[in-house]
Regions:
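Catalytic-core regions of core metabolic enzymes
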Residues: 1-314
Length: 314
């Protein structure tokens, strides 16, 4: 595919990890270990203000100490440090950032103010953001595992995009047991910048992606989202599960990632109109992933149903 404006997120030639650490089971330790063990094919730099080395690699106290340009940074440091990090990244010419750190819009007034600082700094330097409050991003074909998920993932042709990091972890664990691989795994978190529509725009033209699964808690930019879903569904199967079918679910989603959850019947009608399949449960989403992983795509109306009763076949 040609150079997409989100290439720095999905195909970075260099990555720096803020908060990379030797402290066992810390988020920074797991992220950097994943990057090393999954065989990332680009340049990799740990940034740690206290240590000269991290996991056997030379560490840098600041991004300004790195002579080479950095396309993507992964941030796993306390929330108060993130606005300053984004500012420093902008001065260094960074194109994209994955903010794993939580404690922003979902954490009350102080977190909302901090999130605003991060967004303003990113906009000043045209840095695109995934997160905050997310698991991270994976591109197995290039060894990019910028997540704190314990365990890898096989390369495949399914893209999975989710606002829930916990659900990402669950489906990745399940996929390993069921031999299902992924072209991309994107944990959106609070989706303060890059949204579902932009991710779909990338995936629809990605030759490694043959089908797309999504877990949605809420949509911020409905018009661009529906346009992107319509374009994607014309070319590739798109299957999603969305919470908020009931009032209690909508309230829980709002408190989880500060998402805006719209009227469910309106969403249902819109999804159906653009040709996207909505499933009702997480189990059904897992089943869809297994079905899509086989690579078989029926064409036309030559489908036979074998059943031991009339009801199940209707």
């Amino acid at each position: 595919m040609g150079k997409h404006y989100l290439n720095s997120l999905f195909a970075p030639k260099s990555v720096a990890v803020f908060g990379a650490s030797d402290r066992i089971d810390s988020v920074g330790q797991i992220v950097f270990k994943n990057m090393l063990e999954c065989g990332y094919k680009g340049l990799l730099y740990p940034i740690n203000t206290k240590n000269a080395t991290v996991q056997g690699q030379r560490a840098y106290a600041a991004i300004a100490d790195i002579a080479e340009p950095i396309e993507l940074v992964v941030i796993a440091t306390p929330p108060q440090s993130v606005p300053g990090i984004i500012e420093a990244c902008g001065l260094h010419g960074v194109k994209a950032a994955v903010i794993i750190t939580a404690g922003f819009g979902e954490a009350g007034a102080a977190g909302i103010a901090l999130e605003k600082e991060v967004i303003e700094a990113a906009h000043r330097y045209n840095i695109r953001l995934i997160g905050p409050n997310c698991l991270g991003i994976m591109r197995p074909s290039i060894g990019l595992n910028a997540t704190f998920n314990k365990g890898g993932v096989n390369a495949g042709n399914i893209a999975f995009v989710s606002q829930s990091g916990a659900l990402c972890t669950a489906i990745l664990d399940w996929a390993q047991r069921n031999d299902v691989g992924f072209s991309s795994v994107v944990s959106m978190g609070s989706s303060t910048d890059v949204d579902f529509g932009e991710i779909l725009d990338y995936l629809v033209s990605d030759p490694n992606t043959h089908s797309i699964l999504m877990y949605i808690e809420g949509i911020r930019h409905a018009r661009s989202f529906m346009s992107a879903m319509r374009a994607a569904a014309r070319i590739k199967p798109v299957i999603l599960v969305k919470v908020g079918r009931h009032a209690s679910g909508s309230k829980a989603a709002m408190s989880h990632t500060a998402s805006l959850v719209g009227a469910d019947d309106v969403f249902d009608a819109a999804v159906s109109r653009v040709g996207v399949v909505r499933v009702q449960t997480i189990t059904q989403l897992f089943t869809a992933a297994k079905a899509l992983s086989c690579g078989f795509r029926p064409v036309g109306n030559r489908l036979a149903i074998v059943t031991n009763g009339g009801g199940p076949g209707v």
